[in-house]
A protein has these predicted regions:
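A structural motif at transmembrane helix-loop-helix junctions in multipass membrane proteins
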Residues: 58-93
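Membrane-interfacial segments
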Residues: 38-46, 77, 81, 146, ...
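Helix-loop-helix units of permease transmembrane domains in multi-pass membrane transporters
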Residues: 1-23
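Alpha-helical transmembrane segments of integral membrane proteins
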Residues: 15, 19, 50, 54, ...
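Alpha-helical membrane-inserting segments
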Residues: 30, 34, 38, 69, ...
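Terminal transmembrane helical anchor/hairpin motif
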Residues: 83-153
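Hydrophobic alpha-helical transmembrane segments
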Residues: 1-9, 31-34, 75-88
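Secretory targeting signals
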Residues: 18-71
Length: 153
């Protein structure tokens, strides 16, 4: 029904990207609330609510960078979707699970989530977060440009 109206593919995909951004933010915030609630339920004396929420939301630039890779891959064509899925899987394997699988540091550094600390209360490197946001914006722009040039039929 939506595609029967005069909606451009770029605006439709940008709406999906905005939805992904809001959803990722909510999931990260709810994960932080869950951590605080779980710690309070067992009587733990951990970091404060603000520290946990900042730690959770600090992962947002890396998450958006991975989502932007998927967006750009789709913009270039449906055959490129495998590149987007590879980015998601490699980010998971090399980011949070990189030390567990014994990946070398140079390889783990290719995953966006390795550049932001997952530890609650750790200082957030603003330079890395800013660079990831710039990369995500550049990938969104590239994906939108590619989608405009693409024949969707």
């Amino acid at each position: 029904m939506l595609l029967a109206t005069a909606v451009s593919p770029v605006s439709r995909l940008l709406a999906a990207a905005a939805t992904a951004t809001v959803t990722a933010t909510l999931v990260l915030l709810l994960a932080g609330v869950g951590l605080v609630t779980g710690a309070a339920a067992v009587g733990g004396d951990g970091p404060g609510v603000v520290d946990v929420l900042v730690g959770a939301v600090s992962q947002l630039p890396a998450t958006l960078a991975v989502a932007a890779i998927v967006y750009a891959a789709y913009g270039f064509g449906s055959r490129w979707i495998a590149v987007g899925w590879a980015a998601v899987v490699l980010d998971l394997l090399l980011g949070p699970l990189g030390t567990l699988i014994g990946a070398p540091q140079w390889l783990r550094d290719t995953a966006p989530h390795t550049h932001l600390p997952a530890d609650v209360g750790a200082p957030v490197p603003l330079t890395a977060a800013f660079i990831l946001i710039v990369v995500a914006t550049a990938l969104l722009t590239t994906g939108s440009w590619a989608l405009r040039r693409r024949d969707l039929v």
